[in-house]
Regions:
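A short acidic, Gly/Pro-enriched loop at the edge of an enzyme's catalytic core
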Residues: 101-110
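Core SAM-dependent methyltransferase catalytic element
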Residues: 189-209
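Short alpha-helix
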Residues: 161-182
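Conserved class I S-adenosyl-L-methionine
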Residues: 1-35, 148
Length: 209
């Protein structure tokens, strides 16, 4: 049986832009309201579509942007680097098992996570780690599938424990400022694997330490 790293390598080897070439729709929407620039970490960011969108936007606005991409798959990381070079953008990549991170404190201005789904133990580690690694006033932004997504069968893991409960998710950020928080139905068309009505959690959270 393939291990998780090789499963993701195989998935990313099969097609280009398996989750689409454009950034996630919520990431595009929230940047109309929030300026996301500075040192930015993309978690489980695959081929880099969201980070590259943010990097290009910051460049167009004359803002500094440093992009770090962490993912399980070396194939995805290599493709992300290639796409960055094609667009004249800079991207730092790291092959990272998110269950085994020594999170650096106060390191990032922003963390983004779009459809980054993990087992319950790793979910806890990641959400706690995100808060640790963001600076005071830093932003955590993203879109995830909620536990109700199992009913929809339009993308994401097929095990409920890999999905997110909104109340449990919020418990990690009870001292922080919710700029945007939405739980409900959206239509998504992002590559072959995310198609149709979906039940998501959207968030933009400003960390207050």
């Amino acid at each position: 049986m393939l291990n998780i790293h090789n499963e993701w390598d195989e998935r990313y080897s099969q097609h280009d832009h398996i989750y689409g070439e454009q950034a996630n729709a919520f990431i595009q929407d929230i940047t109309q309201k929030l300026s996301i620039h500075g040192k930015t970490l993309g978690l489980a960011e695959g081929e880099g579509r969201n980070l590259l969108y943010l990097a290009a936007l910051a460049q167009a606005n004359g803002q500094a942007f440093e992009a770090d991409l962490w993912d399980y798959s070396q194939v995805a990381l290599d493709k992300a680097q290639g796409y960055a070079q094609q667009r004249g953008l800079s991207l730092n990549t790291r092959k990272q098992d998110l269950s085994q991170v020594d999170w650096p404190a106060n390191q990032y201005d922003n963390v983004i996570c779009v459809f980054g789904h993990f087992n319950p133990e790793t979910q806890q580690k990641v959400l706690n780690g995100v808060r640790e690694t963001l600076v005071n006033g830093g932003l955590f932004v993203g879109e995830l599938y909620s536990t109700r997504q199992l009913e929809y069968k339009t993308g994401g893991p097929r095990a409920v424990e890999m999905l997110y409960d909104p109340i449990e998710f919020l418990s990690h950020f009870k001292h922080d400022h919710l700029i945007h928080f939405f739980v409900g139905d959206v239509e998504r068309s992002e590559g072959k694997l995310h198609q149709g009505k979906s039940h998501v959690i959207q968030f933009a959270i400003r960390i207050q330490k």
